[in-house]
Structures are given as structure tokens and as C-alpha cells.
Amino acid sequence: MAAKDVKFGNDARVKMLEGVNILADAVKVTLGPKGRNVVLDKSFGAPTITKDGVSVAREIELEDKFQNMGAQMVKQVASQANDVAGDGTTTATVLAQAIVNEGLKAVAAGMNPMDLKRGIDKAVAAAVEELKALSKDCSTSTEIEQVGTISANSDSSVGKIIAEAMEKVGRDGVITVEEGQALHDELDVVEGMQFDRGYLSPYFINNQESGSVELESPFILLVDKKISNIRELLPALEAVAKASRPLLIIAEDVEGEALATLVVNNMRGIVKVAAVKAPGFGDRRKAMLQDIAILTGGTVISEEVGLELEKATLEDLGQAKRVSITKENTTIIDGVGEEAMIQGRVAQIRQQIEDATSDYDKEKLQERVAKLAGGVAVIKVGAATEVEMKEKKDRVEDALHATRAAVEEGIVAGGGVALIRAASKIVDLQGDNEEQNVGIRVALRAMEAPLRQITKNAGDEESVVANNVRAGEGSYGYNAATGVYGDMLEMGILDPTKVTRSALQFAASVAGLMITTEAMVTDLPQKDSGMPDMGGMGGMGGMGMM
């Protein structure tokens, strides 16, 4: 085991604070409408330019191990804010820095760290309740656009495209962000249920121009197994042929004789048919087949539940208004499933999302909800260069998370005003002793830090602005972009309540732990002994001089 270096008391806290300040100072220059960019060097390719707080924080690793511990703890604040709310990472970092700096001053003055922490926790819990009371529902498209614009660093084009995407696919719809090919942003909306499986044979194509299969009012046969024997399919094919309607087969696979016979029947015009593989793998495939069955009013033919393909009737088949199949994707539009059944399925998947532990599972379940409930929108980010593209994509993703958070928990006045109003409501809060009261005052002072930093980045006098905003009421605040005081909600400067709340909670949580630190332990750098001597060459006996 390597030898350890240990620091105690003030020595430890000073080093930790230095690390906190180095990281926070690099992150906080990005805050607000006039925040600056940070350039991040990469080991390969061009440097990355960003205004995303968590991207800056993740890049910072300090040489001094004690300083690095402080920096890593603040990095944790930014990462947690990003994971929970998807935005507010810079605000959380600024709050954590303010609480740690104020708190450690009180510790140096002889206050009890544990009581300070209890006071801070008490103030934050009260402030969170006040934030909830200040919160307004985010219901209109204009408000969604404003939240997106603010989160994308006052880029109104981003706010507009996110609001448009939400309008088209609904609040539950999936919105994804991709790198586009054009110079401007594009919005691509897929209505209905789309999954990433294309036709099994190009001979199914009936629209030569687009190279796709278009089926009008088809029956949909859902099978949870491989189909290789055509005899199993004959009863369903005959029933569909009599009804003179097309058929889409979605199965684990269709191969050999079965696929060849379907192709021949299709080409001869006996029955208009197409086959695709079922989406997903394993249990996820079974679940998605069931989703399609509920959406189209059909039944999954599965031997697990005692249903045989030979005995399938028209009643077992799903139906839709239209199906479009390309080489890569299948889209089912207007399935005839009952609305109550679809809503029940959506509620069931939502419950699974709450119970899921991995982000990957949550994302996949959320996609299934969207496919059942609304649709999928893809925002394709446009830019002139790859460096600009990456920077803009980061901002669009932040803005998208912020708008989702706003829809979920509502909105409060932006620009750091909500925290100042929450602090002013709890100014009379008392702890159990004087040291807890100091902790409460530390938290209240720290809650001004985001407004002060936004003002400082805009090149204005932070104390003057903070006093003016404190003297106001409600959503009265300072628009750093224009240098004007006024109603923040009317000026469209909004923050999602969830973002502000989680930034404060995570900052206080980690800062409280740092204030109560009394010792720090790290590995001593190992002394490098260099390469060992190679030693002389052994004698080569028997080789006398000639």
C-alpha cells in the first residue's frame, strides 16, 4: 500500500478551498447573457469552445492532490445538477463556491462546523419551499420558448425551435438533438410510431421514387418468433387476401421459403404484403411488440401465451391508417387501438421509468412512451464549422433539458431574482443556537451570488444591482443583456423552478460536507528511482586477442 500524505484542520481546508476556487472561477465566467466562452484543449482534433458549465468542470484536473479533492467535490455539484435537471450547472457551482467561502470564514473564526452545516441545511430547506410557492406553471408555447432562449444563452432561434418541437410532439414526445448538414437549424418531426427496422426484401418496394413501401389501411400481423415455414402463414394470408387489404408482418425474422413466397405473392399482385423484423432484443422486443399491438388494436401471436400462427384470424390482426417502410425505418400512422388501452399502457411504462435505476433504461422507456403518446422530433443543429456545431449542440441540449424541467415543475423569475426573493422571505429564520444562525446567514448571503456573478460578467457594479433588486418585489429584477430593471417574467427572463431548486440543494449538500472537513488524506507521490543500471556485459571466455 502506498504511503499517504495527511493534512489537518486549517491547512487542509485552505488547500481544499484553493481547488474549489480554481474550478469555480473557470466555470462562472460562462454565467448569464454576457457570459464568456471557455476553450478546452483536446488531446486530438480542434479545441472545444463551450459556455456549458459542466463541460468546463469535467475537464479540470489539478496537479496538487489536496486542491484537486476540493475541485472534484465541486465538479460533483455540477454533474448532479446536470443529471437531475439537465441545466443550472454553472449556478450550482457559483452557489457551492459562495457557501464554502463564507462557511470556511466562519469556521476559521472559531464556529462549530456541524452547527454551521445544520443552519445552512435549515435555510436551504426553507428557501426550497419558498421557491415552490413562487413557481408558476409553464403552459404556453411563448413561455417554453423564453425558457429555451435563456438556457441557450439568449439565442432566440434555439428557444423557437424547441417550442415548435414541443408543440408538434406534445409534452411527452421524444425530442432528440443531432448534428445537421445545413448552416441553419432544422426540425424533423415523425408522427406516429417509428422503429428502426426496414423492409426484409427490396422486392416489397411499391414506391419506386422514394424507394419505400407504402401500405394504405393495412392489417398488421405481430409474431413473437421466426417464420420460415409458409404453411404457418397461409390462413392469415388467405383471410387478408379475401378482405382485399395489404398486410404488414412484424416478426422476430421472416426467412427462407416463407420470405420467398411472400415476395412472389407481392410481385404477382395476389396479396400486397411486406415484412419487417420486430424492434429491440430479448425482453425489450416482447415489450415493444406489445406496444405495437395496443397501438393498432391487435394481438401478439406468441406460443408463450398459447397462441399459434396457423390459427390466427383477422380479429388477431392490428390495423392502421397507413404504414411507411424505408430501408432503415418503419412508421405506423394512426393505429386503431383504443385510447383507454393506450393511456393505460403509457401509465404502466411511466411507472417503470420511476422504478428504473439506469439512465439507459429510462431513456429507452421514455422513447416507448413518446412513440405511444405523441411522436418523435429531431432537431438538426446547423453551423458553419465543426467547432461551432459542437458548442451549439451543447447549448441546444441544455435548453431542451431546461424546457422539460420547466414543464415538469413550473418557472420562476430568472437572472438570480428567484433566489433573492426566497432569501428575503426567510430572513427572520432562527436556528437552535447562534452558530446555526450564522449558518443561516451564510446560506442567505450565498443565494445572492448568481445575481452578482451575472452582473459582474455583464460589466456592471454587482453591489449596486444586488441592492436595487433586493429593494424590489415579486419578479422585479435586472436584465443583464440590456442593462434595464423591470419585471423579469414580462421581459421573458425565466428559469425552471426545478433547475434553481436542484442547483441550491446540491450546492448546499456538497458545500456542507466540505465545511465540516477536518482532515484530508491522499497518496504521496511515488519517488521515481529511474531505470536500473544495465550492468556490464559478462566476459566472453575463449576469445583471446589474436
Swiss-Prot record:
Give the multimer and partner information. Answer: Forms a cylinder of 14 subunits composed of two heptameric rings stacked back-to-back. Interacts with the co-chaperonin GroES.
Binding of ATP, residues: 30-33, 51, 87-91, 415, 479-481, 495
Which HAMAP family does its entry note?
Answer: CH60
Q: Which GO terms describe its cellular component?
A: cytoplasm
Q: Which reaction does it catalyse?
A: ATP + H2O + a folded polypeptide = ADP + phosphate + an unfolded polypeptide
Q: From which organism does this entry originate?
A: Vibrio vulnificus (strain YJ016)
InterPro entries linked to this entry: Chaperonin_Cpn60_CS, Cpn60/GroEL, Cpn60/GroEL/TCP-1, GroEL-like_apical_dom_sf, GROEL-like_equatorial_sf, TCP-1-like_intermed_sf
Enzyme Commission code(s) on record: 5.6.1.7
Enzyme class label: isomerase
Q: What compartments host this protein?
A: Cytoplasm
Query: What keywords are annotated for this sequence in UniProt?
Result: ATP-binding, Chaperone, Cytoplasm, Isomerase, Nucleotide-binding
Question: What name does UniProt use for this protein?
Answer: Chaperonin GroEL 1
Primary location? cytoplasm
Q: Which family does it belong to?
A: Belongs to the chaperonin (HSP60) family.
